[in-house]
Regions:
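Rossmann-like S-adenosyl-L-methionine
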Residues: 2-31, 186-188, 192-415
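Short, solvent-exposed loop/turn elements at beta->coil junctions and helix N-caps
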Residues: 80-87, 152-153, 161, 165, ...
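Short, acidic/hydrophobic/Gly-rich beta-strand patch recurrent on exposed beta strands
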Residues: 109-112, 176-178, 307
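Short helix/loop segment immediately N-terminal to the Walker
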Residues: 149-156, 273
Length: 415
């Protein structure tokens, strides 16, 4: 989902549950036989975040496989979906909204479906456990430090959200306190008390969001402890993660997903590769180890800065990044008579658009590797590409978000 890096567009529930199917497609859970599972969350009815609550994991995979097979039947063979050995506690980015009830109880958790009412959640079955414990302890610390939660209606109060990000390979932890003001009373003592409870915390950042907005993060970050970022390793490379950086929430499946994407590119060390919607450069940097040259293109300026930093951090010298619209960039390449052997595209859930897809056709790479997080928009985009000279060779679904309807897919297209 490299096109979604940067700030949040709206206040999400903990697993981005409000994803709606396009074109009237039936919801996946309606296709499931709903075989019962012992993994039933006590907050399920209030939160509504997990579409497959109480459904055995094997049944979830079976349902998703059948759905993708039917959806992509006009285009190609669909390989067996790649699931997880342990589908619990996989989210390494945890967001909690904070509020105070009419009775004065401080609550922290997810928004109730289709509302801004906060469901108080102490432990979520799909979230990294230490992150949940940190959020719980922050909630318990607020009264002793006289920190009030922010009220959306009145604009009164201080703490709006807490974001915890943890590196899967490194174990580094970043805590982001989203406040309505840059002033946190007794900030040094607060950080000291929090680190005493959780000494594994690597950095604490104060993010200032002083606007009446549905965005979670503001534009200004103040580092209270540590470097203001953490690092994690993926496919042998090290990546910097700052408060607003896009970085996949399920590192176990992401590594498998990216390895498949690089494999499908069939790189021999000579190819010129375009990493479109490159985000913070993860796929492109990994691909650069086996390519002749990689060009990363991304519209988000902050993401490009992170991408350049990540390339330097990994001593990757055969990659260049451009802060530009990927479609426009490739059209200009084609007009100049330039070529690319492979295009790797990782668009947001809304998919690509005709302007970008037409630029792919004009540039005419031998192979296109499409990394999708939206099945219906994937099918739509494949329809366009197959009408313009490309053949879909195969598709491999990945279950990066167990207990939800979301499906990621790697697709190979060739001329």
């Amino acid at each position: 989902m490299a096109g979604n890096q940067g700030n949040y567009r709206e206040k999400p529930t903990r697993n981005e549950k409000n994803y709606k199917k396009a074109n009237g497609q039936p919801r996946l859970k309606e296709k499931s036989s709903r075989a019962k599972s012992d993994n039933v969350c006590p907050y399920a009815k209030k939160c509504g975040g997990c579409d497959y609550q109480g459904v055995e994991y094997k049944e979830q995979l079976k349902t998703k496989q059948a759905y993708m097979k039917k959806l992509l039947k006009p285009f190609c063979f669909v390989e067996p979906i790649v699931g997880m050995k342990n589908p619990l506690y996989y989210r390494h980015k945890v967001h909690a909204a904070f509020d105070c009830t009419r009775r004065g109880q401080i609550v922290a958790g997810a928004y109730r479906k289709n509302t801004h009412d906060v469901v108080d959640i102490e432990s979520c079955m799909i979230e990294e456990q230490e992150s949940d414990e940190i959020i719980k302890d922050i909630k318990d610390m607020l009264r002793s430090f006289r920190i009030k939660t922010y009220d959306e209606d009145t604009g009164y109060g201080l703490l709006r959200h807490v974001l915890v990000r943890k590196g899967y390979a490194t174990g580094q932890i970043m805590v982001v306190l989203v406040l309505a003001s840059p002033i946190l009373p007794s900030k040094n003592n607060f950080v000291k008390a929090l680190r005493k409870k959780h000494p594994n915390i690597t950095t604490v950042v104060l993010n200032v969001n002083d606007k009446k907005t549905s965005m979670v993060l503001g534009d200004r970050n103040i580092t209270l402890y540590g470097k203001g970022f953490i690092e994690d390793k993926l496919c042998g490379c090290t990546f910097r993660i700052s408060p607003s950086s896009f970085y996949q929430v399920n590192p176990v499946q992401t590594e498998l997903l990216y390895e498949k994407a690089i494999h499908e590119a069939h790189l021999t060390g000579k190819e010129r590769v375009i990493d479109a919607y490159c985000g913070t450069g993860t796929i492109g940097i990994i691909a650069a180890k086996n390519a002749g040259e990689v060009i990363g293109v991304e519209l988000n300026r902050d993401a490009i800065r992170d991408a350049v930093t990540n390339a330097k951090r990994n001593d990757i010298r055969n990659i260049r990044f451009y802060n530009d619209d990927a479609g426009k960039f490739m059209v200009e390449m084609a007009q100049k008579g330039e070529k690319a052997d492979v295009v790797i595209m990782d668009p947001p859930r809304t998919g690509s658009d005709e302007a970008f897809l037409s630029s792919v056709v004009k540039l005419s790479p031998e192979r296109v590797v499409y990394v999708s997080c939206g099945p219906e928009t994937l099918a739509r985009d494949l329809k366009y590409l197959t009408k313009h000279g490309y053949a879909v060779k195969r598709a491999t679904p990945y279950d990066c978000f167990p207990y939800t309807e979301h499906i990621e897919t790697v697709v190979l297209l060739c001329r």
